């Protein structure tokens, strides 16, 4: 018996329809908001507020419809939002208010509508799904026009209440709708008088927009709407751009920005049926959730969960890793010293430490690790570097099919193509063709390829073969021909 469904949108190793797709190797600098999200995660992990496994679980738990839209770092931002709200570090109400550019307050909202006023219920067709919404406005009135008949009072926001959070008390209205306004498509089959029959629905203020009498009449005259019902997808006609809202803060519409993707009906004709669209979105640099990620960092900073100086120090350390030259330094020493090379292959952390190079992504101390049955028991979030050597018979290639685990401590941030679904899918399934077609690396047929799928807490770096013609070179000179790609196995060092 299965009590849950396991969504495999993140697990792309060997995906069939990825094999026909080219790899976009365009190199670009990460945008400031992407770097801030990466630094935020590093900082939260160091503080013990979340773990890498929790981050992964949050990403994997995103519904497929959202995962197909979100970029790599957008998924990180949505995952952090979910994890921190689960832990109570910050409330969903605070994150939503931060996104809307509204000062967080527990003060009740002032009623903005009067009895007799014409209104429209906001369509439920926009996205934000870091957590599943609790909605108390039935789908058949989404996008419908009606008339306010009563204001019973102010009630607590059910969206935040469902998560045990105290949000802002909202005015609740009773809104009358005619059948003609709700189901215009059924007009031809209506019984006599039925079009003017009606339904009165309780609707909270954030869901409502004011209409003039003229707009109300025009909408009734031109009605053609498809209501969102539990067995259908949300309407797509009212697609809103995800911008920050700095206008009148009474224009409280976080419900219609609130998270529809987990309500969407999912089709699973094949495991990878929508991957090609997701790949195209990766390449388009379309970031619908960037404003949410930016607001997340700002809200956590304002709340004191992280400090600005800590965040900037973490960014500086990531930049330093990017430019440290640690990988080329290790390779050049190994090429020059056979004993060091052997040490590097058997205990990379200790060998690197002798050169004052740290190989773990976080602050765990491998020297202090406990031992169980003679084996080291590492602390949570520790990562262990393994160095694998290319030989005349074996060429090594590094990837991560489940996310994009990478030796950040040695190489800095991974390139976008390493994170891409195409690389992750093809690396394990057709490595020889991938290297030849996308990287121009043609290997002898007799040389095998060993792919290292870094799916857990080991990180891999390739020790390339020293090219001929470098005899007598100094370590400083040798470093100049060791590239990032040669340390991943997508290239080999060359002497011009």
Curated annotation (Swiss-Prot):
Oxidation on Cys-403 is essential for the activity. Oxidation on Cys-405 stabilizes the Fe-NO ligand coordinated in the inactive form. Residues 229-269 are annotated as: Disordered. It catalyses: an aliphatic primary amide = an aliphatic nitrile + H2O. Keywords: Iron, Lyase, Metal-binding, Oxidation. Its EC number is 4.2.1.84. Residues 259-269 have a biased composition (Basic and acidic residues). Its cofactor is Fe(3+). InterPro entries: CN_Hdrase_a/SCN_Hdrase_g_sf, CN_Hdrtase_a/SCN_Hdrlase_g, CN_hydtase_beta-like_N, CN_hydtase_beta_C, CN_hydtase_beta_dom_C, Elect_transpt_acc-like_dom_sf. Fe(3+) binds at residues 400, 403-405. Residues 237-258 have a biased composition (Basic residues). The modification Cysteine sulfenic acid (-SOH) is found at residue 405. The modification Cysteine sulfinic acid (-SO2H) is found at residue 403. One of its GO terms (molecular function) is transition metal ion binding. Binds 1 Fe(3+) ion per subunit. Pfam families: NHase_alpha (PF02979), NHase_beta_C (PF02211), NHase_beta_N (PF21006). SUPFAM superfamilies: Electron transport accessory proteins, Nitrile hydratase alpha chain. In the N-terminal section; belongs to the nitrile hydratase subunit alpha family. NHase catalyzes the hydration of various nitrile compounds to the corresponding amides. Industrial production of acrylamide is now being developed using some of the enzymes of this class. This is Probable nitrile hydratase. It comes from Monosiga brevicollis (Choanoflagellate). The lineage of its organism: Eukaryota, Choanoflagellata, Craspedida, Salpingoecidae, Monosiga.
